[in-house]
């Protein structure tokens, strides 16, 4: 039995990290009785341990709540939880496409942050009704009136009806639910039209295969229907249709406006593409739903198993993660130093760290990662254009006319005391200043054009340390621009180690090369012969360190005696070392590859 459309409300919660979004979701679940007190844990919707530990939401969750409103009517509210981090903007846009309204949660002490803004603009693009909620009013440092003014001045929303709440104590929960019913429009859509459903997420279950989460836009879907995925053309028979209350519960059918999941023994993860449209195989919809794009990775790095025989396990693990995470891409890669592995593409650095951690935790893999790199556009002397995401794939310098790198427009919000250090950091990172806005007497928004390569290197860490953790950052891709870029190779014992190569700006090559060789000198164990470590651009060495040889004390047996006797023994040792150097090889320990990532940060 499906619910009448006028009693359905689909909404999501948008907020900056740590403004209390997951806790507010907990209160809504508790208030509507979706979970008993016994089942309640903090941050119910953050199902991964990793999400709880880092205090961030990565995967989307969709929950159906039943709420009896003050008008005596029972409503069905579908809460679609969204991640707030800049790397996951695409996931946010998918959730927003499945809703009609959004709760904008702002911390009463901190005010508006960069990512709040970015997500609000996305919500406005999707024409959502936005309900401002000022959270954490129980804090001694809360200033709800200042935040209310900020919402009006910065975003331009009418905040006179903003709801004051405290997700921790549960104040304002009922007002929020009433506001959703009063202000969010019910879904529109014809239950009898051909089926059109938007996939906004999918998970992989080892028993039931790939399970898409979707919002029905037109028509209805029942158990036993034959469905087709419009992007891939694959067809399946539906075994089960259900909703989350947060635990999965089967239902007869889902009609236009409702949110739920289906299982259809879908073996291949690639069939349930996020953003694809599900339609009926017998009576297909004329066109797929709009607003869907294939998501492009921004950051690439190599992942190699420490034990090369676990290569197949790594591939299986990546395929399973890719199911849950449409934005992860990978292809095989071989490296002279590291053997077989994968070149993986991510949305950003946080996304990269999370995937690595999940591979290590959930699949028990030990990994070596190479330094992250962005996608460069290389224009050849013959006019050809190639995209390079791996420094080893860069053509020879005489074949390159110029190299272009991706630039982003970054918005940095910071307390006004830190404007100086932030501007200094942006200058160091080759940024160009665009403009500066005072949001209130204490807070400033700075806009800069910055190369993406600098942001993925260590920009975020530096920004946090220079502003004592107060600044927040959001960025969007602007396009490509020519830059003075060079490829820097690292040679150990006169042999290039391909996994340590990187593309860097000419002005920073020396500092980066110097930092790297010094770091490697500390990490590579001493051999029985001298080992030179060099950083080189082309054939020109720009920095060098030498690891001195381990030497046996050959003079231990000589007590006194003539100096020529000692000299003879030392010369003989030296000769042996020389021969050894010609045939010796140096094993580079795993820590050395990790060092490349940290070389710029120390």
From Swiss-Prot:
It is a peripheral membrane protein. It catalyses: GTP + H2O = GDP + phosphate + H(+). Residues 6-188 form the tr-type G domain. GO terms for biological process: positive regulation of translation. Keywords: Cell membrane, GTP-binding, Hydrolase, Membrane, Nucleotide-binding, Protein biosynthesis. Pfam families: EFG_C, GTP_EFTU, GTP_EFTU_D2, LepA_C. GTP binds at residues 18-23, 135-138. Its EC number is 3.6.5.n1. It comes from the Bacteria. GO terms for cellular component: plasma membrane. Its main location: membrane. One of its GO terms (molecular function) is GTPase activity. It is found in: Cell membrane. InterPro entries: EF-4, EFG_III/V, EFG_V-like, EFTu-like_2, G_TR_CS, LepA_C_sf, LepA_CTD, LepA_IV. HAMAP family: LepA (MF_00071). PANTHER family: TRANSLATION FACTOR GUF1 HOMOLOG, CHLOROPLASTIC (PTHR43512:SF4), TRANSLATION FACTOR GUF1-RELATED (PTHR43512). Belongs to the TRAFAC class translation factor GTPase superfamily. Classic translation factor GTPase family. LepA subfamily. Required for accurate and efficient protein synthesis under certain stress conditions. May act as a fidelity factor of the translation reaction, by catalyzing a one-codon backward translocation of tRNAs on improperly translocated ribosomes. Back-translocation proceeds from a post-translocation (POST) complex to a pre-translocation (PRE) complex, thus giving elongation factor G a second chance to translocate the tRNAs correctly. Binds to ribosomes in a GTP-dependent manner. This is Elongation factor 4. It comes from Moorella thermoacetica (strain ATCC 39073 / JCM 9320). The lineage of its organism: Bacteria, Bacillati, Bacillota, Clostridia, Moorellales.
């Amino acid at each position: 039995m499906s619910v009448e459309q006028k009693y359905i409300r689909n909404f999501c919660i948008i907020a900056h990290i740590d403004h209390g979004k997951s806790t507010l979701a907990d209160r809504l679940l508790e208030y509507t009785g979706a979970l008993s007190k016994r089942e309640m844990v903090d941050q119910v919707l953050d199902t991964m341990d990793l999400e709880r530990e880092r205090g961030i939401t990565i995967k989307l969750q969709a929950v159906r709540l039943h709420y009896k409103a003050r008008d005596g009517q029972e409503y069905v509210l579908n809460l679609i939880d969204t991640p707030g981090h800049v790397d996951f903007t695409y996931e946010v846009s998918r959730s927003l496409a499945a809703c009609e309204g959004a709760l904008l949660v702002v911390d009463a002490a901190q005010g508006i942050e960069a990512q709040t803004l970015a997500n609000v603009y996305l919500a406005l693009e999707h024409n959502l009704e936005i309900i401002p909620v000022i959270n954490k009013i129980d804090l001694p440092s809360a200033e709800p009136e200042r935040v209310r003014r900020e919402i009006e001045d910065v975003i331009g929303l009418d905040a006179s009806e903003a709801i004051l709440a405290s997700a921790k104590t549960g104040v304002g929960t009922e007002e929020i639910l009433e506001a959703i019913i009063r202000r969010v429009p019910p879904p529109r859509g014809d239950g009898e039209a051909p089926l059109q459903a938007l996939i906004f997420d999918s998970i992989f279950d080892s028993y039931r295969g790939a399970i898409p989460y979707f919002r029905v836009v037109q028509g209805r879907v029942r158990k036993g229907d034959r469905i087709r995925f419009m992007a891939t053309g694959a067809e399946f028979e539906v075994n089960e249709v259900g909703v989350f209350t947060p635990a999965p519960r089967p239902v007869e059918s889902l009609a236009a406006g409702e949110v739920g999941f289906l299982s259809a023994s879908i073996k291949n993860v690639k069939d349930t593409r996020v953003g694809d449209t599900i339609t009926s195989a017998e009576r297909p919809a004329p066109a797929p739903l709009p607003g869907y794009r294939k998501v492009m990775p921004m950051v690439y790095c190599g992942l190699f198993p420490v034990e090369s025989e676990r290569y197949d396990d790594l591939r299986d693990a990546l395929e399973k993660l890719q199911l849950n995470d449409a934005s992860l891409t990978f292809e095989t890669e071989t490296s002279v130093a590291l053997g077989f592995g994968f070149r993986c593409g991510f949305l950003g650095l946080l996304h990269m760290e999370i995937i690595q951690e999940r591979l290590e935790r959930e699949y028990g893999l030990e990994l070596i990662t190479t330094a992250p790199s962005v996608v460069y556009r290389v224009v050849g002397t013959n006019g050809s254009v190639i995209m390079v995401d791996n420094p080893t794939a860069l053509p020879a310098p005489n074949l390159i006319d110029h190299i272009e790198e991706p630039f982003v427009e970054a918005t940095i919000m910071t307390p006004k005391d830190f404007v100086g250090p932030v501007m200094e950091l942006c200058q160091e990172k080759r940024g160009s200043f665009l403009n500066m806005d005072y949001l209130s007497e204490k807070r400033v928004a700075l806009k800069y054009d910055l190369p993406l390569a600098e942001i993925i290197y260590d920009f975020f860490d530096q920004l946090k340390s220079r502003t004592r953790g107060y600044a927040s950052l959001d960025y969007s891709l602007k396009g490509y621009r020519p830059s003075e870029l060079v490829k820097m190779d690292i040679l150990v014992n006169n042999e290039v180690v391909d996994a340590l190569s990187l593309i860097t700006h000419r002005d920073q090559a020396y500092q980066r090369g110097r930092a790297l060789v010094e770091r490697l000198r500390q990490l590579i164990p001493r051999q029985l012969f001298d080992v030179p470590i060099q950083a080189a651009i082309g054939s020109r060495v720009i920095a060098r360190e030498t690891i001195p040889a381990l030497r046996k004390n050959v003079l231990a047996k000589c007590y006194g005696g003539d100096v020529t006797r000692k000299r003879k023994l030392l010369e003989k040792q030296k000769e042996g070392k020389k021969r050894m150097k010609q045939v010796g090889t140096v094993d580079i320990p795993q820590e050395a590859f990790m060092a490349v990532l940290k070389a710029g940060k120390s």
